[in-house]
Curated annotation (Swiss-Prot):
Belongs to the complex I NDUFA7 subunit family. This is NADH dehydrogenase [ubiquinone] 1 alpha subcomplex subunit 7. The modification N-acetylalanine is found at residue 2. It comes from Bos taurus. It is a peripheral membrane protein. Keywords: Acetylation, Electron transport, Membrane, Mitochondrion, Mitochondrion inner membrane, Respiratory chain, Transport. It comes from the Eukaryota. InterPro entries: NDUA7. The modification N6-acetyllysine is found at residue 40. One of its GO terms (cellular component) is mitochondrial inner membrane. Accessory subunit of the mitochondrial membrane respiratory chain NADH dehydrogenase (Complex I), that is believed not to be involved in catalysis. Complex I functions in the transfer of electrons from NADH to the respiratory chain. The immediate electron acceptor for the enzyme is believed to be ubiquinone.
Length: 113
């Protein structure tokens, strides 16, 4: 990168009314301090900084299948068949999204196509 000569630097400094090369490298004001205070976090299950293993704070280990509180279905007793299983199996028909399709009949007049 090209730099200006001493005369050009002096001319720019004189025209601007201040020293432009004084803060050339540190041109950003928002530089944080090297020593930071410890963060003020709310107390929770993982607020400890030591002896806080990942496996103890993992929420997936606490997830379980849902427990059934109440069911509208009747529970069968082990070893007994269902009371109306034979009747219910014969009454059910296949579910279709539309009314049944009519079967087309071939024409009865001569000649057959």
């Amino acid at each position: 990168m090209a730099s200006a000569t001493r005369f050009i630097q002096w001319l720019r400094n004189w025209a601007s009314g201040r020293d432009l090369q004084a803060k050339l490298q540190l041109r950003y004001q928002e530089i944080s301090k090297r020593t930071q205070p410890p963060p003020k976090l709310p107390v929770g299950p993982s607020h400890k900084l030591s002896n806080n293993y990942y496996c103890t704070r993992d929420g997936r280990r606490e997830a379980m299948p849902p427990s059934i509180v109440m069911s509208s279905q009747k529970v069968l007793v082990a070893g007994k068949p269902a009371e109306s299983s034979a009747v219910a199996a014969s009454e059910k028909k296949a579910v279709s999204p539309a009314p049944p399709i009519k079967r087309w009949e071939l024409s009865q007049d001569e000649p057959y196509l």
